[in-house]
Amino acid sequence: KSSEVLGSNNLHLKGTINNNTSSPTLNLVAEMREFDLAFAQEFVKGVFGNLRGKASGDLVISGTMSDINYSGDIAMEQLGLKLNFTGVDYSFDDTVISLSRGLAILNDVGVKDGRTNSKGSISGAIQFETLSSMGVNLVMRADNLMLLNTTQKDFDLFWGRIYGTGTLYVDGPVS
């Protein structure tokens, strides 16, 4: 069967779920055609805000319910998000992100903070076996990029605006 989620979001799920065994198996394809990423905001609200953009591509989902495997190349357009901890809202160049079992691979994706004289790029991997156990292994290169944009109301210990140029390595769990 094919169904649409939230009206015109253009997400079609096709395939089979075999629940005639003790561990149901999946053999599905999620077809996204300019799927509105704001749909996922509720799932990542602890880390990201203002999630936006469109996703297009096919995501193959297979395996048992306790061991789900997925893979696909997803084209991202007009992607943007706010890092809640830093208060900075970034927009990203259109790109293709490769997804496979627990990994999203970023390959030199351009990033901007909304000002005309800033730019950067990000490469690496985001690990997410489950949404509650995300991790990152990223390299971010910045040229006058905003890194912090908070007020004392946001964080009493440290706040303000910080702009930076250089290379930032981030590795570890997101919590």
What are the residue ranges of the model-derived segments?
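Interface amphipathic segments
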Residues: K1-D58, S66-T167, P173-S175
